[in-house]
Amino acid sequence: MIKVKICGLKRDEDIKCVNRYKPDYVGFVFSKSKRQVNLEQAKMLIANLDSSIKSVGVFVDEALEYVYNTSKILALDVIQFHGLEDEEYMRHFNEFTIWKALKVRCREDILNLNYKYADGIVLDNKTAGSGKCFDWDIARHIKIKKDLILAGGINEENVETAAYIVNPDIVDVSSGVESQGYKDSSKIKMFIEKVRNIK
């Protein structure tokens, strides 16, 4: 079964919503973004998060010590690196589950991956959180020895097609479950139901 990550939670209402509809993962963005949260905000949100839902911290080219301390304080389940973090950087986080984002341009980008310290690879377009897809055919039925997380422009209307083409382990949605810049409870409900019904 394909798992679901809802990314970019900021408000108490967002937590109440995901606690009700139970995605597998939720993401908290610590890099500069309209969805950015700070440590104190994240601490309060995670404190109210259902224990069955795993927390993911999203970081972009942050200082190593900041990422490590934030991840320890919040007891994050997953650290997602979305910048230019290399193997030397990622090896300092081997006590955590690590996802590394790849801005997909061609199939070789995926096949030539050699992220020793990453447990999962996030396939995204060049501009994360933009709501735009990359060409999924590039990743058609690709096989890697890590969790494959598909992001970038996914929503309730196209997630079935995306799942059929790429066959990911996890789908990662942010703007695809928003209305006017905020997480939309009905869209989250419909998205999760749609993914749970994919055969």
Swiss-Prot record:
Domain of life: Bacteria
Catalytic reaction annotation: N-(5-phospho-beta-D-ribosyl)anthranilate = 1-(2-carboxyphenylamino)-1-deoxy-D-ribulose 5-phosphate
EC number: 5.3.1.24
One Pfam entry name: PRAI
Entry's Gene Ontology molecular function annotations: phosphoribosylanthranilate isomerase activity
Similarity comment: Belongs to the TrpF family.
The protein, known as: N-(5'-phosphoribosyl)anthranilate isomerase
Gene: trpF
